[in-house]
Amino acid sequence: MNANGTIRTLLLALSFTTAAAFAQKNPLDEISSHDGLAKVNVKGIDLAYKSADVDIARYGKLIVDPVEVAFRKDWNPTRPGSNLKLSAADRENIRTGVAKVVQEEFEKALKAGGGWQVVNEAGPDVLRLKPKILNLYVNAPDTRQAGVRTFTLTSGEMTLLLEAFDSESGAIVARVIDRQESRNTGQWQLSSSVSNVGDTREIAARWARILRDRLDKAKGAGKK
């Protein structure tokens, strides 16, 4: 299966994968096995796969590709207080806003404390990260309409598909998939662009911390 075919199949599988299914055998296991990846356990991540033939410790630099974002197929909201569908411009603003927040949190975590050097060119010691946000679902998009207030239990949910490749050969090194829903306090909260962005940033920062921790551990293991 070529790379494009794998991604298309992954997207299809993810669109039908529920939270409960993440804990059981699912099509993603077979797809990743097809790519020569073995399933591994990563605390805080639903699914993780790694190539047994590649030592991540060999990499000292990273390329972080621009974050891609796709909405969940059944997400078709109306403007708050109206029966009008959300405009294409509003949808694009949400998509680019989420991409920007995730990109910022990943690069901030990776660079923190002089950790990993993020570069733009491929090299023998460069690992390419390709982050994608899939199945983005925003419960109450804020279109800043006067006199309209919306309350929700959660801001929404999104799924991370992060793949790591050797920057020169293009060989896949690792793949992780994780679905996250924003915090649910059990109380109705006023929804706004500020709260939506804040919840997105919280989830992205969590993913970024786990990524940084795993990369640091791999690098440390390679020095022993």
Model-predicted segments: where are they?
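Surface-exposed short loop/turn segments
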Residues: 108, 112-171, 182-191
